[in-house]
A protein has these predicted regions:
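Non-heme Fe(II)-dependent double-stranded beta-helix
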Residues: 1-11, 18-134, 255
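Phosphate-binding beta-loop-alpha motif at adenosine-nucleotide cofactor sites
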Residues: 16-17, 203
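Non-heme Fe(II)/2-oxoglutarate
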Residues: 39-52, 175-179, 196-199, 206-266
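A structural signal for short, well-ordered beta-strand segments
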Residues: 104-107, 148-150, 222-226
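Histidine-centered catalytic micro-motifs
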Residues: 118-124, 165, 207-210, 224
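Short, P/G- and charge-enriched loop/turn segments at secondary-structure junctions
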Residues: 131-138, 187-188
Length: 266
């Protein structure tokens, strides 16, 4: 993570890392999803995420598909390789510190044309959330829960998808409700554009949400959340037999690096 990238992450609370996945890796991941998409679910209307905002309304819910790491081979391989991808590890080492761990199992989030948006959320504002935070001390950033999103399709201007309030991870006041509903102050809100193969990294402390999806092609994002090695948001899970040394390092339960926790340098 170079000095420019550190500055941009500190400034905005997120960073787009380009071309982490090769076109071949993207194609294999999409092929695996096509093979299993009938196992996914569309979020039902009674579980709507739009917060009652007409600006975020959609005629359908977003799609969600889990269990990717446990699919049969070769379909599982593209996603297992994402866990400790060499193009991602150096960024997480800087953002979370060496010895970081995966806290939430990765899953596919997809949006077809017309899918609803998601009201703004995040842990910025008054008070301190010990799970989701951003602190800068002694020349280093310290983050709680952090999201890495592998993009499997392009997100172009106007398509919808992920939106953030840049810099809100350092805000000291609550986000106004009309802004959370995307009804006011849109000039301070940014749609995050990216290409298939890019990874979007953001701290859960930054205020973020999604806009309804308007593109003819689907949005496909592989989401997982990482945290410092000694922290946990969700309960730990059994170590899978298939994990290699790199994958085991990020699947370890939470404990401090001084207790010989395995770390990845790259």
């Amino acid at each position: 993570m170079n000095e420019e990238e550190k500055y941009l992450f500190d400034l905005n609370g997120y960073l787009v890392v380009e071309n982490v996945l090769t076109p071949e890796e993207v194609a294999k991941a999409n092929e695996a999803i096509d093979h299993h998409l009938d196992q996914g679910r569309l979020r039902p209307r009674e579980q709507t995420l739009d917060g009652g905002s007409p600006e975020l309304w959609g005629d359908k819910g977003r799609g969600e598909l889990g269990g990717l790491l446990n699919w049969e081979e070769p379909w599982c391989n593209p996603f297992r390789e994402m866990l400790a991808h060499p193009g991602l590890v150096p960024y997480l080492n800087e953002i979370l510190g060496k010895g970081f761990r995966m806290d939430h199992h990765l899953f596919l989030l997809w949006m077809d044309k017309g899918a609803e948006g998601f009201i703004f959320h995040g842990s910025s504002g008054p008070g301190f959330d010990p799970n989701q935070y951003y602190i800068f001390r002694n020349g280093r950033m310290h983050n709680g829960l952090t999201v890495a999103t592998f993009q499997l399709t392009d997100v172009n201007p106007g398509d919808g998808g992920l939106i953030v309030i840049p810099g809100s991870h350092k805000s000291n006041f609550p986000c106004p409700q009309e802004m959370r509903l995307y009804q006011k102050h849109q000039e301070h809100i940014r749609q995050v554009t990216c290409k298939a193969g890019d990874v979007v990294i953001f701290t859960e402390a930054v205020t973020h949400g999604t806009l309804p999806w308007t593109a003819d092609h689907p949005r496909r994002s592989i989401l997982t959340r990482y945290t410092a090695g000694n922290l946990a948001y969700v309960p730990a899970y059994p170590m899978p037999e298939w994990a290699n040394e790199r994958q085991r390092a990020v699947l370890e339960p939470p404990y401090h690096t001084r207790l010989d926790r395995p770390v990845l340098d790259e």
